[in-house]
């Protein structure tokens, strides 16, 4: 048995083109508002740190910075720079979504679902990276803790978490439902 795709008329491709354009536009908007995005990321980091630590946390959103350990002897601040933000880790997910939307428009709902889940995973991975840095600074001290937390373990968390998020996205976007598996059998 051979599967043949029916030709799609220009009128019915318009929503598809708009969806692809919307996903690409979301990527452009994220790049344009990355500073505001970083401020939100720092606010989220501050909220998480307030829950997991009692040593005092202050967020300077306008400086994209979070300070912790304020009640101790060695308070420390982290500034969220563009390369440390999850905003640029979201861009590959948006590009893959746009490409898959273009070539597999019938999977639009599944693609948007997988984009949402994977985007949340990327954001949480970056928060885990920040928590790793904070934990190591608290445990090993400022110099060694920051070195190990930011340079080595933080980078590993980002790379491995980003890869897992991308694999999760592709798996969610391309897997078949039970009904599709039964129909194919």
Feature roles, as predicted:
Residues 1-185:
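Hydrophobic N-terminal alpha-helices or hydrophobic patches in metabolic proteins across all domains
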């Amino acid at each position: 048995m051979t599967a043949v795709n029916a030709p799609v008329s220009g009128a019915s491709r318009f929503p598809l083109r708009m969806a692809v354009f919307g996903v690409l536009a979301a990527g452009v908007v994220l790049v344009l508002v990355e500073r505001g995005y970083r401020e939100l990321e720092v606010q989220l980091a501050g909220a998480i740190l307030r829950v997991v630590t009692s040593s005092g946390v202050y967020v300077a959103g306008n400086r994209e910075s979070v300070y912790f350990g304020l009640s101790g002897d060695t308070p420390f601040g982290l500034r969220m720079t563009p390369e440390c933000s999850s905003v640029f880790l979201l861009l590959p997910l948006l590009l893959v979504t746009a490409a898959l939307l273009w070539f597999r428009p019938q999977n639009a709902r599944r693609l948007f679902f997988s984009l949402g889940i994977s985007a949340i995973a990327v954001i949480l991975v970056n928060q885990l990276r920040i928590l790793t840095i904070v934990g190591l600074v608290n445990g090993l001290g400022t110099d060694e803790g920051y070195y190990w937390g930011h340079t080595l373990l933080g980078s590993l968390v980002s790379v491995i978490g980003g890869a897992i998020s991308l694999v999760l996205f592709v798996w969610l976007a391309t897997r078949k439902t039970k009904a599709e598996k039964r129909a194919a059998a």
